Amino acid sequence: MPLNKDIKKVLVIGSGPIIIGQAAEFDYSGTQACQALKEEGIEVVLVNSNPATIMTDKEIADKVYLEPLTVEFVEKVIEKERPDSLLAGMGGQTGLNLAVELYEKGILDKYNVKVIGTSIESIKEGEDRELFRDMMNRINQPVIQSEIITDLDAGIAFARKIGYPVIVRPAYTLGGTGGGIANNEEELIETLTSGLQLSTIGQVLLEKSVKGWKEIEYEVMRDSFGNCITVCNMENIDPVGIHTGDSIVVAPSQTLSDKEYQMLRSASIDIINAVGIEGGCNVQFALNPHSFEYAVIEINPRVSRSSALASKATGYPIAKVAAKIALGYGLDEIKNAVTGMTYACFEPSLDYVVVKIPKWPFDKFQGADRVLGTKMMATGEIMAIGSNFEAAFLKGIRSLEIGKYSLEHKKFKDLSMYELRERVVSPDDERIFALAEMLRRGYRIDMVSKITGIDIFFLEKFRWLVEEEQKLKQSTIDDLNREWLLKLKRRGFSDKAIADMLKVSPDEIYRLRDIWHIKPSYKMVDTCGGEFEALSPYYYSTYEQYDEVVVSDNKKVVVIGSGPIRIGQGIEFDYASVHCVMALRKQGIETIVINNNPETVSTDFSISDKLYFEPLTEEDVLNIIDKEKPDGVILQFGGQTAIKLAKFLKEKNIPTLGTTSDQIDLAEDREQFDDLLERLNIARPKGKGVWSLEEGLEEARRLGFPILVRPSFVLGGQGMEITHDEEELTYYLTNAFEKDSKNPILIDKYLMGREIEVDAISDGEDVLVPGIMEHLERAGVHSGDSITMYPAQNISDKIKEDVLDYTKKLALSIGIKGMINIQFIEFEGKLYVIEVNPRASRTVPYISKVSGVPIVDIATRIMLGEKLKDLGYGTGVYKEPELVSVKVPVFSTQKLPNVEVSLGPEMRSTGEVLGVGRNVFEALYKGFVGASMYTGDKGKTILATIKKHDKKEFMELAKDLDKLGYNFIATTGTAKELREAGIDAKEVRRIGEESPNIMDLIKNKEIDLVVNTPTKANDSKRDGFHIRRAAIERNIGVMTSLDTLKALVELQKEGAHNRELEVFNLI
């Protein structure tokens, strides 16, 4: 039992939906913490709104509440469950803010709930900018000259006093939200206004900019006895001025002298002791590169993105140790699971280099401002491990899945030196490639360091890589000898990079490696630099001599993970991968995971029998398969990243379990799939693949507008658009064929019907459909961005029968063994198939949780040869539950400057929440609250700007809203039509007209909800785009689909928002 015998039932607060700044790392830390508590025999009650997480599984906690993370709903859970303790530091900023609010409102006192781990007072000292600054002054730790600001005038006065540039840092926000660097008064007014609005306590720290200093982080652990260690120190390659979540980070630090390292280590320990942290804490410093001057930037008094990275970089389980400390254990009492003999008080030592590179979503947002600053924009990250910096860095580049295997990028070749300089002075996500091009052209390293703030140490490494690339380009395959090839492999060059530069195929390099016996060896991540024997089966590749992998003769299966979190391929695929691993291990099969995402549960070495932290490229995967010789490889759960390897593995005669490469092609190749549908007599929207602009226009004339256009072989609707006329189609096709002329563009007649979705399991003979899901928004909104209801609410029995019939026919005809995801449209009483994915989809965690069917477990067992009829869940459509569950998407567009907000066929959401109720209205209300959507609870003024062919439908909704007490503001045309319909509407001037116009009303927050149906999506020159952006940046609700507005109307008419709602334990 824990040292504190009073702790028997602990409430753990999760972090909610995946958003920029708060991603899968909190599923990893939350899962680890829950397991650590259960190990001690403590009952765990978990509240989290995100259904796509492992931590919300019944195996992880004793009670699981998928409820909105608000004081109101968490109080209901506390009232029902009566926990004696609350663990606050595992749910990111969301969990921390919620714990503070519960404490301040007296709810924790009311129910006698004690906060364990870091106290609320310590959390406040770490989070409140003023308290933290005062504390630093008391313990003589230097902070940057700054002032706490709560109004605009005081901010302007302070900036004038200290001079520009200044940094704006709002209190209690996430990922630098609302902050930024202001170079002049105009920029300050804009950033400060936003920061004060977005801070939960209306407080901002305004500080003198030390942009260009080094940014160094220490991950520190402290127990309640005052024992303290540094787990890991990390160096941002990018200087202060770029958010650490958007920086390339290396561990351990590479450029600090011993004196600097010890100075900052001592400072971090002094800080964590002064604040009184009990558990994990991240301390960030700015270090002057030309002296020993430093300043404390901030601390995170909780587990964080950096602590997930530090855990994976060192093998030290920070969240688990923090949870044990919260129970009263000392660091010297907690065993290190990696060695099995040392304790958590041993500081890890690393004999390798770790590099983290962020993954940005700009492929989804063509018009986005890509310049990096103090506001985080990355959706995810990769981590790479190497025996030297260059090897880890190049592994990192190829892990990003951006089609790059070296530091060469074609788009920078034609830029002038002036243009390249601009790209690194205002750094963006591609700055490394611009910088490499400058070095390639002989730009002086000291000058590059001066303008970028990047240390000369790293620039010299980049220059060496660039020089080797140039040598290769000037050589032929005959010039390559064993010594040179081994040197390149040791420095991280992939076969593909070497082959591209020598203009041969990667197979040719692989053949030479085979002849010359140049094979990777695998080293263990052991936390102790090889000082003690390690038990952790956690490996990275190197081309050094000694290999630490012991290959067994057991039956074994490799599971390919899904790589970094990105829009369209999120945490749902990690959920599926982890469940696949669990199912295999239950069957006694040795399970090997290959993945490169430091945030996820799948890369926790305790999950699988072996973990290879490697890029998911053909070469890196093949090297491991060559080594392990598994009985099979599973690709179905790793999203498109894994599926893309199917053809390659087939060519190499490597067995894949479940659906084969040919079957995947049958589902994804347009012509083959159309032939199959014709044979099965299943309808699909009319259309075809076209290879040229002329052919596309001809097909569009035949089908009639509107037309849905998209590239083949994509994920998350990437590049998909609805075009309404020939001008729009010409613009789209011209751009699409410029990007990719080797594949056709798919053109479909756009049907505006109801969208229906199923995830099904097939064993080749029978099919099980765990549930039929209905999308609230009509077709044309990407399925990942639609509100999804289960059980389906508006589908006739006849259509349900057709859904099952079509699903069976498709699964059996394709030959699916395992999972299949199918999307349908019901249009004018007829069912059409619009998409088939022969793999796990992003709805798998949702439908698994709400139907009670362990989908991944069943699918995995089928891949191993079992039959559906023997697994206890039957066949056909599974019985529907009594409760209604609604999945609501969550967007991070507020954090990305100048990107589109409206819903459309390209996916834009980063996460999701669940709403569970006795009926669909209760579920929707909870979903809206959990997703921080507009619910009408706080204000009832609507700005309506509606396109012509939506006006009739809008008027019907406006009548209902009028009866519900809403006020309308509209531009001349819409206002006139509202008045003609008997609805009072205030007229407002358009953008660009004299004040007060639409923008003034939005800026002054005189509007509570913007209803705007876009005329031309993705056109940032139009007024609608500016209205949507201005609203979202000021936390004003925006709805761009009338279906979403209709849902709001219905739940208000039903009174779901005024009812006393229950909370439900889903176990």
Curated annotation (Swiss-Prot):
Manner of cofactor binding, per the entry note: Binds 4 Mg(2+) or Mn(2+) ions per subunit.
EC number(s) stated in the UniProt entry for this protein: 6.3.4.16, 6.3.5.5
Q: Which UniProt keywords apply?
A: Amino-acid biosynthesis, Arginine biosynthesis, ATP-binding, Ligase, Magnesium, Manganese, Metal-binding, Nucleotide-binding, Pyrimidine biosynthesis, Repeat
The residues listed in the UniProt record as binding Mg(2+) 2, with positions renumbered to this chain, are E298, N300
Question: Which residues are involved in binding ATP 1?
Answer: R129, R169, G175, G176, K208, V210, E215, G241, I242, H243, Q284, E298
- This protein's source sits in the domain of life called Bacteria
Q: Which cofactor names does the annotation list?
A: Mg(2+); Mn(2+)
Pathway noted in the entry: Amino-acid biosynthesis; L-arginine biosynthesis; carbamoyl phosphate from bicarbonate: step 1/1; Pyrimidine metabolism; UMP biosynthesis via de novo pathway; (S)-dihydroorotate from bicarbonate: step 1/3
**Positions with a binding annotation for Mg(2+) 4:** E835, N837
ATP-grasp domain mapped to chain residues: 133-327, 674-864
Which residues does the annotated region (Allosteric domain) include? Answer: 933-1067
Which family, according to the similarity comment? Belongs to the CarB family.
Q: Subunit notes for this chain?
A: Composed of two chains; the small (or glutamine) chain promotes the hydrolysis of glutamine to ammonia, which is used by the large (or ammonia) chain to synthesize carbamoyl phosphate. Tetramer of heterodimers (alpha,beta)4.
Q: What does this protein do?
A: Large subunit of the glutamine-dependent carbamoyl phosphate synthetase (CPSase). CPSase catalyzes the formation of carbamoyl phosphate from the ammonia moiety of glutamine, carbonate, and phosphate donated by ATP, constituting the first step of 2 biosynthetic pathways, one leading to arginine and/or urea and the other to pyrimidine nucleotides.
- Name of the molecule in the record: Carbamoyl phosphate synthase large chain
Source species:
Clostridium perfringens (strain 13 / Type A)
